[in-house]
Amino acid sequence: MSASSLLEQRPKGQGNKVQNGSVHQKDGLNDDDFEPYLSPQARPNNAYTAMSDSYLPSYYSPSIGFSYSLGEAAWSTGGDTAMPYLTSYGQLSNGEPHFLPDAMFGQPGALGSTPFLGQHGFNFFPSGIDFSAWGNNSSQGQSTQSSGYSSNYAYAPSSLGGAMIDGQSAFASETLNKAPGMNTIDQGMAALKLGSTEVASNVPKVVGSAVGSGSITSNIVASNSLPPATIAPPKPASWADIASKPAKQQPKLKTKNGIAGSSLPPPPIKHNMDIGTWDNKGPVAKAPSQALVQNIGQQPTQGSPQPVGQQANNSPPVAQASVGQQTQPLPPPPPQPAQLSVQQQAAQPTRWVAPRNRGSGFGHNGVDGNGVGQTQAGSGSTPSEPHPVLEKLRSINNYNPKDFDWNLKHGRVFIIKSYSEDDIHRSIKYNIWCSTEHGNKRLDAAYRSMNGKGPVYLLFSVNGSGHFCGVAEMKSAVDYNTCAGVWSQDKWKGRFDVRWIFVKDVPNSQLRHIRLENNENKPVTNSRDTQEVPLEKAKQVLKIIASYKHTTSIFDDFSHYEKRQEEEESVKKERQGRGK
């Protein structure tokens, strides 16, 4: 038998497999007998209950717990909507408040069949079948609102039952109001606006209402149950209105003397560090003239200038207070030209000034014939008592000789830049000096090259002082294995003997015109340490220094530097005692 004949005969054999019965089934059976077997065919391939069908009471909580008419809420967080709070099915019971969105159980017959036992249909999509997925929904018969805080919230019903109220209803005929604290976000946003205090005070405090929201506020006013409240429009507060308001008067600050106001602004801060430090280039105010002091003397309070003699006692000298710090009562009179000139002088950055020149202008202190200066003290013009060490030095050495031979035939001259006047004072006191390692080699080579054929002169100047303070002659070669131990800094090694010839302050203005061809044609006043001066130019410098009628010198502050040396030595002894 062929395969084709088998295929043709197989359906016939299957169709005839009916035993003990008629070939036509309807002859012996009723239609109702097959109804229980045909009913499952209505839902083929469905192993779960359809969402639109009513649920079984044996699976869910008792049906009495859902006797409310529920509204709607979105399930997505897209757009301006907020995610509702969902509870589990097992916690639902009768009379308990629960924040279940009305989208869980919608209106009857939305997508499903008739509600089971009077309950609502099981509907996950709010607003029926016209719901636009994941968008801003709008129920039938409701207007769409643009506000983000509109009808997207469902609020807890009371324990007495009743419909849940959406976030859009506003006192129409409901007995229940919105949930407390609903619009805290709206109130917080309204508080950020300009003039928010006025808006918050004018809008009536209604539970569940928004403050500062235009759409919700209009709904509240247009409500039927609430009488129309007269809400004053918020007062406009523009930038022009704010700018037109007068500025608040600032309280006048009082000075230390207790007098408000000042005729002149305060001068720049002056930081005066230790006396004689090479890098102390802070501005120093000069003392006001006598006429200006008399004019300011009419003020209620005036700080008397500290005498120079008192400045040189225990502490480093401090510059006197400038005229700009003096205060005057209100209204302040216009500043006088003399005051402006003194203030401009104080504001300009000046060089480091020696203590002897800080009480008055440079070059105004009286000096006797031997170069011993007189300090101008506030108590009187009597000269200060000379120090015993200075008297001994003056008796041994003939400082500032009048018969000095500046016209050298042989010799070498070098510029010496000192870091402080303390080292100048000790060089004069001990007749020694020490330069840097490079400077010591240069000076030692120059001294040995002369071999007694001519002098080696050293022109001393303190960094930032603005003047040359004296001339000394090198009297020995450099001893590299000796440390003097008397300098203000302990880093100097080596020493050589010197003899001081001139001890006087010669301003740089007297020597600035002399330029050195071996230093890029710079002025002699703009030289580095151990800069050699050509012999012809050195003669000019020595002639000017020898003939200059000085008014100040380091001798004026000799007592001050003596006391500073004693203090430094006591500090060194204390450190050595601690080290042991």
Swiss-Prot record:
What Gene Ontology terms describe where this protein resides (cellular component)? centriolar satellite; cytoplasm; cytoplasmic stress granule; cytosol; nucleus; P-body
Q: Where is this region: Interaction with m6A-containing mRNAs?
A: 386-580
Q: Which GO terms describe its molecular function?
A: C5-methylcytidine-containing RNA reader activity; mRNA binding; N6-methyladenosine-containing RNA reader activity
Query: What post-translational events are described?
Result: Ubiquitinated by the SCF(SKP2) complex, leading to its degradation.
What Pfam families would the database entry show? YTH
Report the residues modified as N-acetylserine: S2
Q: Which GO terms describe its biological process?
A: embryonic morphogenesis; endothelial to hematopoietic transition; gamete generation; hematopoietic stem cell proliferation; innate immune response; mRNA catabolic process; mRNA destabilization; negative regulation of Notch signaling pathway
Specify residue ranges for compositional bias: Gly residues. Answer: 360-372
Residue ranges, annotated region (Localization to mRNA processing bodies (P-bodies)): 2-385
Composition-biased stretches (Polar residues): 291-317, 373-384
Q: How does it assemble?
A: Interacts with CNOT1; interaction is direct and promotes recruitment of the CCR4-NOT complex. Interacts with YTHDF3. Interacts with RIDA/HRSP12; interaction leads to recruitment of the ribonuclease P/MRP complex.
PANTHER family, per this entry?
YTH DOMAIN-CONTAINING FAMILY PROTEIN 2 (PTHR12357:SF8), YTH YT521-B HOMOLOGY DOMAIN-CONTAINING (PTHR12357)
Name this polypeptide is given: YTH domain-containing family protein 2
Q: Which organism is it from?
A: Bos taurus
Write the gene name: YTHDF2
